[in-house]
Amino acid sequence: MLFIELLKAIFFGVIEGVTEWLPISSTGHLILVQEFIRLHQDKAFMEMFNIVIQLGAIIAVIVIYFERLNPFQPGKSPQQIRLTWQLWLKVAIACIPSIIIAVPLDDWFEAHFNHMLPIAIALIVYGVAFLWIEKRHQTLEPRVVKLSRMSYKTAFFIGCFQVLSIIPGTSRSGATILGAIILGASRTVAADFTFFLAIPTMFGYSGLKALKFFIDGNHLTLSQLLVLLVASLTAFAVSLYVIKLLTDYVKKHDFTVFGRYRIVLGSLLIVYSVFKSLF
């Protein structure tokens, strides 16, 4: 039984590692996959699992970008150190809207929108948004082509877009990438800032979910701990590849393919929801 659970954990880790960074909603995909492949765990654990599993993906960002994000990295010039601290300040500023808005409202949105139909609608809405924005920006030159040129004001408004991801199916990376592009950032800058913003956002969110799990009187069994560790380690390994793949992809392509994917998947899920309610 535990062996089967660990195999499922590996599968969920792969899903998380791929969908956390592509703008197609990792939490939405995990919830959808669990319609067909279920871990034999209680509801409280699964609610925590769907979020904390993202830590593996976040650690992959730290590993890949450690030198760039570390202001104490040996060999950095004073100017590079200053730019690194400025980057972290921009990330901190971008976190403010989520702290003020998303954290207090998270439980309410999870209770009312953490279902297949709202997820499907969110997939379609943001899929259409990606297609519209990419078409609109085809002839426009981005104003922000380097992270060092991003203003603190722009960082704050990107953080405001991140708040939209409180709705399951939206995609945190999708919301911030869309916001960054709308605000004049290049696709490369949008993707990079999304990666960096994920570090404090998801560490904080995962920490709150884990804390709530234990405050509510729940305890991790050994099998649950193994499932969580295996899924997180798998998400970490897969993310190492997917992050590099996406950074290479956005240098030559736009996000249209992800918009189309979201629309197709969302439409299929609506059809599935209708049939499920009828039969």
Swiss-Prot record:
Disulphide linkage map: none
Pfam families: BacA
GO MF assignments: undecaprenyl-diphosphatase activity
Main location, first listed in the record: membrane
Cellular localization per UniProt: Cell membrane
Taxonomic superkingdom: Bacteria
Enzyme Commission number, as recorded: 3.6.1.27
Membrane protein topology class: Multi-pass membrane protein
Gene Ontology CC: one annotated term: plasma membrane
Record keyword Cell wall biogenesis/degradation present: yes
Residue intervals passing through the bilayer: 2-22, 44-64, 85-105, 113-133, 163-183, 188-208, 225-245, 255-275
This protein's UniProt keywords: Antibiotic resistance, Cell membrane, Cell shape, Cell wall biogenesis/degradation, Hydrolase, Membrane, Peptidoglycan synthesis, Transmembrane, Transmembrane helix
Reactions catalysed according to its record: di-trans,octa-cis-undecaprenyl diphosphate + H2O = di-trans,octa-cis-undecaprenyl phosphate + phosphate + H(+)
Top-tier EC class: hydrolase
GO biological process, alphabetically ordered: cell wall organization; peptidoglycan biosynthetic process; regulation of cell shape; response to antibiotic
NCBIfam families in UniProt: PRK00281.1-5
Extra information: Bacitracin is thought to be involved in the inhibition of peptidoglycan synthesis by sequestering undecaprenyl diphosphate, thereby reducing the pool of lipid carrier available.
Role this protein plays: Catalyzes the dephosphorylation of undecaprenyl diphosphate (UPP). Confers resistance to bacitracin.
HAMAP family: Undec_diphosphatase
Homology family: Belongs to the UppP family.
Protein name as it appears in the record: Undecaprenyl-diphosphatase
Gene source species: Streptococcus equi subsp. zooepidemicus (strain H70)
